[in-house]
């Protein structure tokens, strides 16, 4: 089975320091992959580099092409703190942004675009908020709207940067269920994640990062106390796996 994402010797430099170094991995279809690591490990940088939003050295192939040629096939949900929630835009217009790549220049959204927007809003339980300003919503509701935008895009790959941070339990459950459904349909999903207590529940594969690639593979093989300790290097209070709890340099 051909990889949908192939990264080889990827490095990113910021002025006088190296953010990530010599990252190599491949990801196939139908996987939900958690990107784990301490603050400053380069998780968001790695995601942005794959998406072509950061300059890098090395090679990145998405669907066997450079990312610039497959942007329609990629949906990206950035961190909430990277979004201007005060910008005056309606919920339905935010979701319609997911259709922009499919709408020809100087053309209006068609019936199919509007149908997909409505269906996406219903999937996240936000159809009754379609005419509300995005800034009026709670954090969880805002995140659901951006997930709806990603759904409307009808992509093959989904990249989400800390989608579960600062949201309510209902929104978390809805988002997780939708992501798992997408995975089961053969989509590939990358998630920057920080809550180690839910890794086994959320992910099939984990990519453990601390400027360099520490480990990558199935959760059962890679998500171990040894790999967690090596990844977090004392920046973690507890590691939880099923009934096992390990204290790491408290």
Swiss-Prot record:
Keyword set, alphabetical order: ATP-binding, Cell membrane, Membrane, Nucleotide-binding, Transport
Gene3D superfamilies: P-loop containing nucleotide triphosphate hydrolases
Any Gene Ontology CC annotation: plasma membrane
Superkingdom field: Bacteria
Alphabetized InterPro entries for the sequence: AAA+_ATPase, ABC_transporter-like_ATP-bd, ABC_transporter-like_CS, Metal_Ion_Import_ABC, P-loop_NTPase
List of residues binding ATP: 37-44
Protein's cellular compartments: Cell membrane
GO molecular function: ATP binding; ATP hydrolysis activity
SUPFAM superfamilies linked: P-loop containing nucleoside triphosphate hydrolases
ABC transporter domain: residues covered: 5-236
Protein topology in the membrane: Peripheral membrane protein
Its job: This protein is probably a component of a manganese permease, a binding protein-dependent, ATP-driven transport system. Probably responsible for energy coupling to the transport system.
Record PANTHER family: IRON TRANSPORT SYSTEM ATP-BINDING PROTEIN HI_0361-RELATED, METAL TRANSPORT SYSTEM ATP-BINDING PROTEIN TM_0124-RELATED
Family: Belongs to the ABC transporter superfamily.
Designated name of the protein: Manganese transport system ATP-binding protein MntB
Organism field: Halalkalibacterium halodurans (strain ATCC BAA-125 / DSM 18197 / FERM 7344 / JCM 9153 / C-125) (Bacillus halodurans)
């Amino acid at each position: 089975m051909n990889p949908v994402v192939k990264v080889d010797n990827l490095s990113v430099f910021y002025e006088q320091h190296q953010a990530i170094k010599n990252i190599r991995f491949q990801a196939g279809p139908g996987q939900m992959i958690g990107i784990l690591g301490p603050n400053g490990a380069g998780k968001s940088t790695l995601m942005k580099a794959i998406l072509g939003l950061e300059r890098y050295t090395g090679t990145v192939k998405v669907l066997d092409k450079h990312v610039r040629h497959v942007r329609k096939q990629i949906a990206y949900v950035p961190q909430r703190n990277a979004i201007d929630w005060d910008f005056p835009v309606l919920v339905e217009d935010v979701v319609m942004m997911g259709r922009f790549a499919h709408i020809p220049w100087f053309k209006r959204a068609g019936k199919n675009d509007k149908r997909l927007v409505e269906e996406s809003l219903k999937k996240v339980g936000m159809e009754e908020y379609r005419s509300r300003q995005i800034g009026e919503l709670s954090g969880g509701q805002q995140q659901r709207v951006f997930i709806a935008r990603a759904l409307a895009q009808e992509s093959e790959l989904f990249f989400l940067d800390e989608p579960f941070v600062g949201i309510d339990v209902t929104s978390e459950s809805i988002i997780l269920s939708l992501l798992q459904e997408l995975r089961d349909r053969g989509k590939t999903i990358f998630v920057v994640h920080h809550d180690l207590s839910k890794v086994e529940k959320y992910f099939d594969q984990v990519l453990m990062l601390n400027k360099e690639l520490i480990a990558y593979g199935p959760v059962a093989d890679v998500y171990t106390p040894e790999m967690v300790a090596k990844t977090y290097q004392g920046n973690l209070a507890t590691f939880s796996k099923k009934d096992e709890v390990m204290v790491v340099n408290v």
